């Protein structure tokens, strides 16, 4: 049960419209605030190195687990991008954060793009790392959407694939993080959440959101790898073109290029903020 899973997590909890959100709000309330949004499977615990760098640079930092992941509730109805945006919006309001700096990783970049396009006046800077722009060309997701077959496929293929995927990076992860990642899949409701997550619109096309953000001249930062096999780098380049003079950092190493160099990547983001 998720209640048992989050015992002794060290996270704070708040009941939002759709369930309990586990979050951390660290640093001086008088400092500029960075809200960091994790990706589709790795929860916020994966970004402790980023948080430390942000704090060392005197920023306030808010991180949280999106519904269905980490220590937050397993929401299994109406799992869509609007749910994830609503969670982010309500948490920002609850924490009384204004003129926020957003940093989204992978699917988290889709969430911050959705939020920023609807709340441009509350964003002072936005950063994307390996941003998901559109997952329409991912064959596995198309198969999962097939009735009945999709249920079986998500159980016998997706979950094992997600577990194997992260084990390739086990040597770069702490035992604490690896155990947390594996254990979250044992929490009741996680499997059903992911099935609903992938058949809905959560991973749909966000290019229109980038259009709006770019038109509002919000200062921006992109970090991605051209050899990323999970994110279409051509779509990332198209999104970048929507922005006015964004900071762009290219790396090698695929979707998880930041593994082992988290401090460098986090500091690169801070340096890009402080140029403005």
Residue locations for each model-derived region?
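Conserved HGGG/HGGXW glycine-rich cap/lid loop of the alpha/beta-hydrolase fold
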Residues: 26-71
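Gly/Ala-rich beta-loop-alpha elbow adjacent to hydrolase catalytic centers
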Residues: 104-112
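Flexible "cap/lid" loop of the alpha/beta hydrolase fold
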Residues: 117, 123-153
């Amino acid at each position: 049960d998720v209640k048992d899973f989050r015992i002794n997590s060290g996270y704070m909890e708040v009941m939002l419209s759709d369930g309990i959100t586990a979050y951390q709000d660290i640093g001086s309330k008088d400092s500029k605030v960075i809200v960091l949004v994790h990706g589709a499977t790795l929860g916020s615990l994966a970004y402790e190195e980023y948080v430390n760098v942000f704090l060392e640079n005197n920023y306030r930092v808010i991180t949280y687990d999106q519904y269905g992941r980490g220590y937050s509730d397993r929401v299994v109805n109406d799992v869509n991008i609007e749910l994830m945006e609503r969670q982010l919006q309500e948490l920002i309001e609850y924490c009384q954060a204004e003129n926020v700096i957003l940093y989204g990783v992978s699917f988290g970049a889709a969430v911050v793009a959705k939020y920023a396009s609807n709340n441009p006046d509350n964003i002072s800077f936005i950063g994307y790392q390996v941003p998901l722009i559109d997952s329409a060309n991912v064959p596995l997701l198309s198969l999962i959407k097939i009735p009945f077959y999709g249920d079986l496929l998500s159980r016998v293929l997706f979950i094992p694939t997600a577990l194997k995927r992260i084990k390739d990076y086990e040597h770069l992860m702490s035992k604490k993080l690896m155990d947390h990642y594996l254990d979250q899949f044992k929490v009741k409701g996680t499997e059903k959440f992911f099935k609903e997550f992938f058949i809905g619109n959560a991973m749909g096309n966000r290019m229109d959101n980038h259009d709006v953000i770019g038109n509002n001249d919000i200062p921006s930062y992109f970090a991605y790898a051209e050899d990323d096999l999970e994110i279409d780098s051509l779509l990332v380049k198209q999104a970048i073109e929507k922005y006015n003079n964004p900071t762009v950092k290219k790396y090698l190493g695929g979707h998880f290029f930041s593994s082992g160099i988290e401090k460098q990547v986090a500091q690169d983001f801070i340096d890009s903020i402080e140029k403005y």
